[in-house]
Amino acid sequence: LDKNFNVEDLIKIKYPVMVKPVDNGGGVGMSICNNQDELIQGSKNAINNSRKKLFLTERYMECDDIVAYYTFQDGKIFLSAIADRITTKKQGISSPVCIASIYPSKHHEQYYKKIHPIMSKMFRGLGINNGVLAIQFFVENDNYYAYDPGFRLQGEAMHIHINKINGFDHRIMLINFALTGSMGIKNLREKNDFLFGGKQCCTLWVLLKSGLIKNIYGIKELEKDSSVIFVMQRFNEGETVLENMVGNEKQVLARIYIVSETKVELVSKINSIKSSLSVIDENENEMIVDLLDTSLL
């Protein structure tokens, strides 16, 4: 399907589908389409958000979603993290935006046995020697559908959990490589553990509706919580979430990085944080779109 919307192409489409620009990210320009009218409208939106004025039309996947994060050092390949991605479905036809990542993924054993060898073979064939890479997968009936690879640090910032638990910082490694040609870690094989030594981790995303932020409650208090290793806050009181930020990662108020010893402790901590968080707009309305349902864990 292209911008000409030829009838012979349109009649082949099986709904629902996801339409997205070929050269954008963070959910920008993406739409869920359930019929032909939505498909044409969504495609035009994708084109408007594409530098190349091109878009993709894909089957909309309603299944598990994971991300695998790799480290490369002198041609050696390390799976450094793997997480389940949980997205909100409460924003109409907008692209599902992540509201939490849970480490390690419930699919970690199958992925490592079945998919990791295939990925490693591909990486070697591509000649990747140094760097970091994340790639996401839809998991449906034990089949893995790869999408959205990124040969770079990620907005999710998995390196925060990795540095806290395994003791190596991808940011420093990449700076070392840029300046010296070496990633600068001599014992990476010993330090790297994609299962995080049995710890249970979560990156909790706080998404906001559009509007002027009057009050933020519960974020500042997290600085005193020993289970919260970092809070990445992107909006402050008095700032505005614009309409065009909703439905992509620009609507993220904060990402909260949590480390617990057990799944029970993690669930308890997430529920505690949820009960304390609130963001109020100038009309005294709650702005938080959705928070992780811990019954899914």
Question: Language model features by range: what are they?
Answer:
Residues 1-29:
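A conserved helix-loop-beta module that forms one wall/lid of the active-site cleft
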Residues 31, 59, 103, 163, ...:
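Short, well-ordered beta-strand elements within core beta-sheets of diverse protein domains
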Residues 7-9, 176-297:
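Peripheral (often C-terminal) accessory segments that flank ATP-dependent C-N-forming ligase machineries
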Residues 17, 78, 145-148:
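Protein kinase-like catalytic core scaffold
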Residues 59-66, 70-128, 132, 139, ...:
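ATP-dependent carboxylate/phosphate-activation module, predominantly the ATP-grasp catalytic core
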Residues 58, 129-141, 187, 288-293:
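A short glycine-rich, hydrophobically flanked beta-strand micro-motif that places a catalytic Asp/Glu
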Residues 16-19, 30-63, 93-102, 120-125, ...:
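Conserved ATP-binding module of the ATP-grasp superfamily
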